[in-house]
Amino acid sequence: DGVVWRTADTPENSAAFSRPAGRNGIGGYPQVRMVCLMELSSHLINASAFDSENVSEMRLAAQLAERTPDMSITLFDKGFYSLGLLHHWQMSGEKRHWLLPLKKNTQYEVVRKLGRGDELVKLKTSPQARKQWPALPEWFTARLLTRTV
C-alpha cells in the first residue's frame, strides 16, 4: 500500500523531494511517497520504497518485486492495476503470484473455464504500457477468480 508524507520544510528536503502543485501554485511542504510490502497477518513491513511524491506508486511498487519471496502471493489493492507492474512482479522470481480486485470494465478474452468462477483469461496490453514496460508482451494470460460476496 502507499502513503504520502509531508517533510520538514528544509533546503535539503526541498532539493530531494518535490512539492505538490495546488490552486495557488507550489504546495507548502516537500512530500515523500512510500510504498510498503506488508505481511498480511502481522502487518509487519517486509520492504519499502520511497521517493518524491511525483513518482507513482506503480514505479515504487516495481522496486519491491525483487524483494518479494519466491512461491508467494501478493495482494494488491485496486489502485495497483497495471499489467506492466503485474507482469514484472510475477516474472521477478519463481512462482510469484498476485491477486487484486478486477477493475470495472476490464476487457478480457476467456481462454478456458477451469471451474465455477474460475477462468483462464487473456488481457491485451496497450502500446503505452509496452513502451513503459519493455518486457511486457502484447497479450498477458491470467487466472480470473470471481466470487459473489
Give residue spans per PLM region:
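Single, function-defining residue in the core of a domain
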Residues: G2-A15, A21-V149
